[in-house]
Amino acid sequence: MTISPPEREAKKVKIVVDRNPVATNFEKWAKPGHFSRTLSKGPTTTTWIWNLHADAHDFDTQTSDLEEISRKVFSAHFGQLGIIFIWLSGMYFHGARFSNYEAWLTDPTHIKPSAQVVWPIVGQEILNADVGGGFQGLQITSGFFQLWRASGITSELQLYTTAIGGLVMAAAMFFAGWFHYHKAAPKLEWFQNVESMLNHHLAGLLGLGSLAWAGHQIHVSLPINKLLDAGVDPKEIPLPHEFLFNPELMAQLYPSFAKGLAPFFTLDWAQYSDFLTFQGGLNPVTGGLWLTDTVHHHLAIAVLFLVAGHQYRTNWGIGSSLKEILEAHKGPFTGEGHKGLYEILTTSWHAQLAINLALFGSLSIIVSHHMYAMPPYPYLATDYGTQLSLFTHHMWIGGFCIVGAGAHAGIFMVRDYDPTNNYNNLLDRVLRHRDAMISHLNWVCIFLGFHSFGLYIHNDTMSALGRPQDMFSDTAIQLQPVFAQWVQNTHFLAPGFTAPNALASTSPSWGGDVVAVGGKVAMMPISLGTADFMVHHIHAFTIHVTVLILLKGVLYARSSRLIPDKANLGFRFPCDGPGRGGTCQVSAWDHVFLGLFWMYNSISIVIFHFSWKMQSDVWGTVSANGVSHITGGNFAQSANTINGWLRDFLWAQSSQVIQSYGSALSAYGLIFLGAHFVWAFSLMFLFSGRGYWQELIESIVWAHNKLKVAPAIQPRALSITQGRAVGVAHYLLGGIATTWSFFLARILAVG
C-alpha cells in the first residue's frame, strides 16, 4: 500500500490570489505623485508637473516588484475596458436620442446618417445640415448606422437598451479593476501561466466570442436583414425574440430551419447552405458582403479557435508546452534558436507588449485595406465619407501601434534584457549582426528614396519642358505593375480554380462588373498603372525608413560604438553628459520620437493615395452612359508628377474646406485653420534650444520680482526631451486634424 506524500494532495487546488493585499485608500488621490519619493514632496519648480505626467503610468519606476507591476497593469486594463464601454454606450445613446437612424433605415441610399444636433447658441445651428428625410444635424462618418443594421437593430428603443447595457458592463469592469487589485489580486504565477491564458483567450474570447456573434447573426441579423432588403417597413418586422422562439417564422425565410438539428447530428451539413453560404463578392442590394457569407466565416473561425484553445498543456498531461516549443525551435544556422525567449516573455511585459503592438498595428492596417474592397456592412460602400474615415482611422491606429512596438522593444532592451540569459540565441545573434542589418537597411532606404523620387523628378522636368512623350506614364514610357496585375487576375479567377466552391471572387476590386447601389458605385475593378507603380515605391521608401529608425533604436538601445554604456543612461536621455559633443538624440526614446515623424509621412502618403485613387477610379455615379467618377479618372494622368499631387490633389480638392465658411461644413474650415496653427506651434518646440527659453524666463521672472509678484514655484524651461515630446505631440495632432478636416469637407461635399 502506497501513501502519497501530503504535499501532492495539497497541490490539487492552487491558490493563485492574495486576499486583501492593498487597502482601499482615497487619501492617495489627494496627493499627486504619491508613487514617487521626489514627486510626493510637491512642486518646487515647474518641471514637477512634467515629471508627474511622464511617470504616473510608468509602473516600473514606482516599484521593482514584478508581481505588483503586473497587478497594476491588470487592474488598469479593466479601467480601460470600463472607459471603452462608456464610450460605446454614448455612441448607442446618441443613436437612440439624437439620430435619424429609423429614417435612414427606410432609405439608406438617400438619407445620410446623423446622430448629433448642434444647439443654437450664437449661430452654431448653421452646422446642422439637411441630411434628408426632414432631419437637420451633423453628418456622421463612423459607420455605426451600417453596423447597427447588420446587427439587426430596427428601432431606437433597441439602441437605448443596448446603451444601458453598456453602462452596466462599464460598472462591472470598474468593479473588477478594484476587486482584482484590492480584494483578490492574482499572484505572479497566475500572470505567467501562459498555457492557461492561451487556452482561455483562444477558446473563450475568440472561439466562444465568434460563436456567439455567429449565433446572433443567424438568429437575429439574417432574418431581419432579409426582410429589410426586401423592402419591408422596419416597424412591421417581427422582434428578435419572435425569430428566436418561433422556428416556423424562421423556416419561411430559411427552409432548413424546419429540419431542426437533425442535419447537424447526421453530418448532413449541406442542408444548412441556405444561411451558411459561400457566394463571394458583394450583395447587389446593399453593396456589402453577403451576411450569409460572414455568418459562415464567423462559424468557421469559432470552430478553429475552439480547437486552438485546447492545444496547450495545463493540469492534464496533454497538449503543447510553450517553453518546449520555443526551445525546440532551432534552425541549422540559428545557434540556440528561441532558447531564453520564454523567460523574456514571461518576465518582461514590455517585450510582450512590443510583439502585440506590432501584430495589432499590422492587423489594423490589414483591416483598413479590406474594409473598402470587401465592405462588411450593408450600405457602407456607398457612404464615401464613412469609407474614407474608416480607412484613414485604421491606418493611423496601425501606424501608432507599430511605433509603440518600437518604443516598448526599446524599453525592454534597456530595462529588462539580461545578456547572461541570452547567449547565442536568436535575439543575441540579431544584436551581434546589427551593424550588417542596419547598414543594409540604410542602403535599401537610400536606393528606394533616390529611385522612387527620381522617377517623379524626371516626370516633373519633362512635363515642364513640354515633352510628355518622354515621361513615365500609361501613354508614354509605361511602368506597369505587372506583378500586382497578375495577383489581381489570379484572385479574379479563383472561383474557377483555387476556390471551386465560391460563386464569385472575394471582391469586385479584382475584376468583373461594377457593383452599384442606388446609382452610386459601391465597388468595381480597380485598374493599376504607372502612377500606382510610382507611388507604391514611395510607400516602400517611407515604410523602410520608419523601420530603419525604429529598429536602429531597439538594436542600439543598450550600447553603440559612440556610447558603449548606453544602457546605464536609461531609455531616454538628452546627451551623454558634458564634455561629450555629438552624443545628443541617441537614446532609444529619441528614435521613437524620430520614428513618429516618418510614420506620419508613411501614413499620409497612403491615405492621400487612397483618397485620390478612389475618387478618380472607383467612386462616382452610374448612368446609361457608364460610370462617371468624382474626379474623372485624373489619377493616372496627374499622380505621376509631384506637381500633379500638389495641383490636382491637394490644391484642387482643398477648395471645399477653404470655401466652407457660411455652410454646414464651416466647422471643418475652422478646424483646418486651427489645426494648421497647432502644427505650426509644434515647430516652436522642435526648432528651439532650451537655453533660449531659460534666458527669456529669467528675464520675465526678474520683472515679476521687481513688482513683488514672484511665483512660489520657480519657472523652468522644458528639458530637451520634454520640449521634443510637446513638439511631436502638436505636430501629429495638427497634421492629423488638418488631414481630417480636408478629407471630410471634400468628400461630404462631393460624395
Swiss-Prot record:
PsaA and PsaB bind P700, the primary electron donor of photosystem I (PSI), as well as the electron acceptors A0, A1 and FX. PSI is a plastocyanin/cytochrome c6-ferredoxin oxidoreductase, converting photonic excitation into a charge separation, which transfers an electron from the donor P700 chlorophyll pair to the spectroscopically characterized acceptors A0, A1, FX, FA and FB in turn. Oxidized P700 is reduced on the lumenal side of the thylakoid membrane by plastocyanin or cytochrome c6. One of its GO terms (cellular component) is photosystem I. Its EC number is 1.97.1.12. P700 is a chlorophyll a/chlorophyll a' dimer, A0 is one or more chlorophyll a, A1 is one or both phylloquinones and FX is a shared 4Fe-4S iron-sulfur center. GO terms for biological process: photosynthesis. The PsaA/B heterodimer binds the P700 chlorophyll special pair and subsequent electron acceptors. PSI consists of a core antenna complex that captures photons, and an electron transfer chain that converts photonic excitation into a charge separation. The eukaryotic PSI reaction center is composed of at least 11 subunits. This is Photosystem I P700 chlorophyll a apoprotein A1. Chlorophyll a' binds at H676. Chlorophyll a binds at M684, Y692. Belongs to the PsaA/PsaB family. Keywords: 4Fe-4S, Chlorophyll, Chloroplast, Chromophore, Electron transport, Iron, Iron-sulfur, Magnesium, Membrane, Metal-binding, Oxidoreductase, Photosynthesis, Photosystem I, Plastid, Thylakoid, Transmembrane, Transmembrane helix, Transport. Its main location: plastid. [4Fe-4S] cluster binds at C575, C584. It comes from the Eukaryota. It is found in: Plastid, Chloroplast thylakoid membrane. InterPro entries: PSI_PsaA, PSI_PsaA/B, PSI_PsaA/B_CS, PSI_PsaA/B_sf. It is a multi-pass membrane protein.
